[in-house]
Amino acid sequence: MNRSQIKPELSNSSISAEPPLVNPELEGGDFFWQGGADGVLLLHGLTATTAEVRPLAKRFHDEGFTVSAVLLPGHGTTPEKLSHTNRREWIAVCEKAYAELQKKCSRVIVGGESTGGILALHLATEHPEIKALLLYAPAMRLASSLLRKLFMVVASPFVFAVPKKTEEDRDAMPWQGYKVNPLKAGVQLLKLQADIKKRLARIYQPILIIQANLDETVDLNSGEIIFRGVQSAVRESHWMEKSRHVVILDQEFEEVISTTMKFVKKILQ
């Protein structure tokens, strides 16, 4: 395949007549739902908002958990603002949310979708008291096609973002987020991945990983990379056959919920 065949569609302008968010009517800000003594912190993915984790959060709250979710810096506003944030800012917000939840709960589980899963891994390296990790389509490594696009254009000062090709799929879901992938944010994700890969051996918590067979965003070996690096004695891996990247919102949502709750109850019993 020659370079012309994989040349991505690019955006070199930050000005658009269209709203920057898919499904702007959804609730996408921070939330904290008081429940029992067991807490769950849920972290959304890159370019998304907390709308991504709300259906999962509701199920946890219905089961009696205290549930928290935080909007990462640069999200829920404009892609331009996301381009001016970095991974350390994302981590700082997650640390603050975890500390606040820990004050109110005797046991805390941390979960995340995609980049949120990588941020959950970071928290686990800093907080061995975290009871378990729930990783949904963790973005430990990007799919090769997405990496090619990123590496081809990242050196260009004229390119701002790469438009997403999965917009139609996400329009049909209760998903909220940007219609483009800002390149600077993508670079921050790559740096976050590299940081976490070096720290995986510090993780001992039980881990549940749920991945999607039709995921075209992250490398399908991401879960295996995580399992090869961590020290966790309890680890489970499950695959959703008909789902795409946002596995916590796709058509096998009920199976994701069932698998998650079974794992959590086993850990907390």
Question: Where are the regions that the model predicts?
Answer:
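Active-site nucleophile loop of the alpha/beta-hydrolase fold
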Residues: 134-144
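Short alpha-helix in the alpha/beta-hydrolase fold that links the catalytic acid
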Residues: 56, 205, 219-228, 239
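Active-site nucleophile elbow and catalytic-triad environment of alpha/beta-hydrolase enzymes
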Residues: 28, 182-199
